[in-house]
Swiss-Prot record:
Protein name in the entry: Small nuclear ribonucleoprotein-associated protein B
Per-repeat ranges for Sequence: 111-113, 144-146, 173-175, 195-197
Region (4 X 3 AA repeats of G-R-G): 111-197
GO cellular component: Cajal body; catalytic step 2 spliceosome; cytoplasm; cytosol; nucleus; pole plasm; precatalytic spliceosome; small nuclear ribonucleoprotein complex
Xref: InterPro entries: LSM_dom_sf (IPR010920), Sm (IPR047575), Sm_dom_euk/arc (IPR001163), snRNP-assoc_SmB/SmN (IPR017131), snRNP_SmB/NAA38-like (IPR050914)
Entry keyword set: Cytoplasm, Methylation, mRNA processing, mRNA splicing, Nucleus, Repeat, Ribonucleoprotein, RNA-binding, Spliceosome
Family in the record: Belongs to the snRNP SmB/SmN family.
Organism: Drosophila melanogaster (Fruit fly)
Source species taxonomy: Eukaryota, Metazoa, Ecdysozoa, Arthropoda, Hexapoda
Length: 199
């Protein structure tokens, strides 16, 4: 069954309604939804039932229960009566107003990819601190023509160990070479001295 916009049931969504069932129970609540079988959903629902006592002298009394959100099966419904219009807060838009300041309860979409703030790098992903590990900044800069290069170390000449000391036969097999203290001045490659051609 296709439900059109002119259907009477749609016109009464969010209204307060009174529903009577076959067993004479009455439900009053906010009409939220329905389907082709006339199953109904009520919000803020209360149940009223009349209890007859076994004594005919005592009049029947009405018992009220607060139920909340209720699904009523269509085959048990006898009547549906509109009690009143929807409460005023139901008609207000649920869309945030552009000028309103967001409060702590405003829902936000979960991030799915690149973070919104691209300038902030998450902790642990910044790389090494300047001066600790990695090459110096001068070595990482792109080089152009005519710009003097930063000092770089070349390979040691034959007969020299990396520590800058000439190898001695007596030192062989006695452990690791002494720690490097930097290259000797003759090993630093920079601009050629004046009067000498190229490299």
């Amino acid at each position: 069954m296709t439900i059109g916009k002119n259907n009477k049931m749609i016109q009464h969504l969010n209204y307060r309604v009174r529903i009577v069932l076959q067993d004479s129970r009455t439900f009053i609540g906010t009409f939220k939804a329905f389907d082709k079988h006339m199953n109904l959903i009520l919000g803020d629902c209360e149940e009223f039932r009349k209890i007859r006592s076994k004594n005919s002298k005592v009049p029947e009394r009405e018992e009220k229960r607060v139920l909340g959100f209720v699904l009523l099966r269509g085959e048990n419904i006898v009547s549906l009566t509109v009690e009143g219009p929807p409460p005023p807060e139901e008609g207000l838009p649920r869309v945030p107003i552009p000028g309103a300041a967001p409060g702590p309860g405003i829902g936000r979409v979960a991030g799915r990819g690149m973070p919104i703030n691209l300038s902030a790098v998450p902790a642990g992903l910044q790389g090494p601190v300047r001066g600790v590990g990695g090459p110096a900044q001068q070595h990482m800069a792109p080089m152009g023509r005519g710009v003097p290069r930063a000092p770089m170390m070349g390979a040691p000449p034959p007969g020299m160990i990396p520590g800058g000391m000439p190898s001695m036969p007596g030192n062989m097999g006695r452990g690791a070479p002494p720690p490097m203290r930097g290259p000797p001045p003759s090993m630093i490659r920079g601009a050629p001295p004046p009067g000498r051609g190229g490299y």
